[in-house]
A protein has these predicted regions:
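Alpha-helical transmembrane segments in inner-membrane proteins
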Residues: 1-651
Length: 651
């Protein structure tokens, strides 16, 4: 039914596209190009070559995801979730900016190096845990966000030189020749030949490594060969058409939903489903272009359409369970001297305001007017944002009983950002002003919608699958942002800067309101600690103990939405504070929930102030956004922290 449905939808969308674009007899569509006039030849290449590229690229991405899932025995594995694509894209961006002479050898080699390095990093981080499913996906998430933050820094500093690269990397499938089709066809043929002798070893390895070894399977060699195949195929697809997310994961998830067990049939089916998914996406994007008045990259459409697909697939796999992990950093209950931490945060803010760099070098600033007007608002804005993100992370991890939950990972911050973006674009059309109040309501609506979806899914699926919700929402936001960037609307320049996580726009007149909101939300979080602690034991236990589960849960969701939206409005959605700081607070002895909330708030404020200060001066006179710096710091911290997970996971 799924396959037939995709065939019908692809055929209908393709026919609608032909009716609009092709005015000659249908029989001439596949005639030799040289027999057509110039306009018809261009249209033929645009329609047929683009469709062929979509079919081949989508099919190859589906095969890649099946190989990865078979290799690590994880239904969440794909080129998207394991950071393969972003590694290839970052490598090509670096070469474009700094080593353009290497481009004469073609993009395949550059993308291959990036793909193999990012995938190797993910595997190296998760290997000590024996590829624990959640550790593997978390490592992929961390690498994705970290590499995206690095790419964001490069784009900010080399905006003009990277503009063409970003437009291409958004995933444009439109073709004007058969070159990409031939390259992808050769790749598909070679990949099929390479996979044939691997079918039996992969089947044996899907049972148990020890049994496979006893049967004579060279496990390490097979794994290395599969990794090389995955990296080569992904690199070639990205070098030809840019980054296409979700197609591989969607195709592999559909194969899993169909219950196909034979590895050969899984690969063939994944190729067909991936091909149809990307063809359908490409057709929809082409059909929408005249309506929206702009080119729509297929890569952006896969993110926008992929999120609903993934949510549906999660519900289809609700009976599947993947193992969970214990908190990433355990701690003993210790006495936490909060006044010392509070003084430490105050000193950090003072140093960030007074210890500065200018044209004369480093020194202590004595210009109070300058500090009060510019530096203090930025430091206070960063502190308030870090505080809110950290508190939201503690609340989410307790509420969902998931140590990996945070506004960033579960897509709450992305939902708030999407709400703000849509409000900014749509409110003027509706005759409403896109002011701070209306944008706050838009952001709250987006964050609340994501939270309600997460809580609804949390009762139906394993907590590990909730990670896919965050990946889906983040991909949807990325897709919208790609379209925003390509729209050329000058009003959106400030929004693009805001989305990178900058405190540049902090004002003395508004920062105290932001700090007040952060403190009020922290107090509200402390007031709801008791029912939250009981909810953390499970809804059944909470009801037996007299907790009104639904009202309390909705209150908590509203609180998390307010925390996420206020912080997102302040510095954008990009950071790692909500995921990193709760674990850090626990490791420092704040085991009890109320202590964890207080210490996490102080740590979040301090870390964000430091990130903002580093961003201001590390490349002086240029600046790095605080959110981007926090993402890099947090990503590096988690890369180190994940190495400690096996001890917790196996204990």
């Amino acid at each position: 039914v799924i396959f037939i449905g995709l065939v019908v939808l692809s055929a209908c969308s393709g026919w609608a596209l032909l009716e609009r674009e092709w005015t000659r007899p249908l029989s001439e569509l596949f005639s030799p190009s040289l027999q057509l006039d110039i306009a018809s030849m261009a249209t033929q290449l645009h329609l047929v070559a683009t469709s062929v590229v979509a079919l081949l690229a989508g099919g190859l991405l589906g095969v890649v995801s099946i190989l990865l899932q078979q290799l690590v025995k994880n239904p969440l594995a794909s080129d998207t979730t394991l950071g393969v694509g972003i590694g290839a894209q970052l490598a090509m961006l670096i070469v474009t900016l700094f080593l353009p002479s290497l481009a004469i050898y073609g993009g395949l080699y550059v993308a291959f190096v990036g793909a193999i390095m990012s995938m190797g990093l993910v595997f190296a981080l998760s290997a000590p845990s024996r590829f624990n499913p959640l550790i593997l996906i978390l490592a992929g998430l961390v690498v994705n966000i970290l590499l995206a933050a690095v790419a964001n820094v490069l784009v900010l500093f080399f905006a003009e030189r990277s503009n063409g690269m970003l437009s291409w990397a958004a995933g444009f499938l439109a073709q004007s020749s058969w070159d990409s089709s031939r390259a992808l066809m050769i790749t598909a043929t070679l990949a099929a030949i390479a996979c044939l002798p691997l079918l039996k070893p992969l089947t044996l390895m899907s049972l148990d490594d020890s049994q496979a070894k006893r049967l004579g399977v060279p496990i390490n060699g097979i794994r290395a060969l599969v990794v090389v195949i995955v990296a080569v195929v992904t690199a070639l697809v990205i070098s030809e058409v840019g980054l296409i997310g979700f197609i591989g994961l969607g195709a592999a998830s559909l194969v899993n939903a169909l219950g196909i067990s034979s590895i050969g049939k899984r690969l063939v089916t994944a190729f067909g489903l991936g091909a149809l998914l990307l063809l359908l996406t490409s057709n929809v994007a082409l059909l929408l272009e005249p309506i929206l008045g702009m080119q729509i990259p297929a890569g952006a459409m896969t993110g926008i359409l992929g999120a609903p697909l993934i949510i549906w697939l999660i519900l289809r796999q609700r009976r599947d369970r993947i193992e969970t992990i214990t908190p990433m950093m355990s701690g003993q209950n210790k006495t936490v001297v909060f006044w010392r931490w509070s003084v430490g945060v105050i000193i950090t803010i003072m140093l960030a305001c007074l210890f500065v760099q200018d044209i004369n070098g480093w020194g202590i600033s004595t210009d109070w007017a300058l500090t009060q007007q510019y530096r203090l608002p930025r430091s206070l804005s960063a502190a308030a944002t870090g505080m809110m993100l950290a508190v939201a992370g503690v609340l989410l991890q307790t509420l969902t009983r998931n140590p990996m939950a945070s506004p960033e990972v579960l897509g709450v911050s992305s939902g708030a950002a999407l709400g703000v973006i849509l409000g900014f674009l749509l409110l003027p059309i509706l005759g409403l002003s896109a002011g701070a109040g209306t944008l706050l309501i838009s952001g709250l609506s987006g964050a609340m919608a994501v939270l309600l979806l997460i809580m609804w899914l949390a009762r139906r699926v394993s907590s590990g699958y909730l990670l896919l919700v965050g990946i889906g929402i983040a991909a949807m936001m990325d897709g919208v942002m790609h379209m925003v960037k390509l729209s050329g609307d000058p009003r959106l320049e400030a929004m693009l800067s805001w989305l990178s996580g900058t405190t540049y726009s902090a004002q003395p007149s508004t920062v105290w309101y932001l700090m007040g909101i952060a403190l009020i939300l922290l107090v509200l979080s402390l007031l709801i600690v008791k029912p939250l602690r009981v909810l953390g034991l499970g809804t059944g236990v909470a009801r037996n103990l007299g907790v009104a589960v639904t009202p309390v849960t909705l209150s908590l969701l509203a609180l998390v939405a307010a925390l996420s939206t206020a912080s997102t409005l302040a510095v954008g959605p990009l950071s790692f504070i909500g995921l990193m700081v709760p674990h850090l607070a626990t490791s420092l002895g704040a085991v009890k929930l109320e202590r964890q909330l207080l210490l996490a708030a102080l740590l979040g404020a301090g870390v964000m102030v430091i990130a903002d200060w580093i961003g201001r001066y590390v490349m002086f006179p240029y600046e790095l956004p605080a959110g981007t710096v926090a993402a890099i710091i947090g990503g590096g911290y988690f890369l180190w922290l994940i190495r400690k997970v096996p001890t917790a996971a196996n204990s």
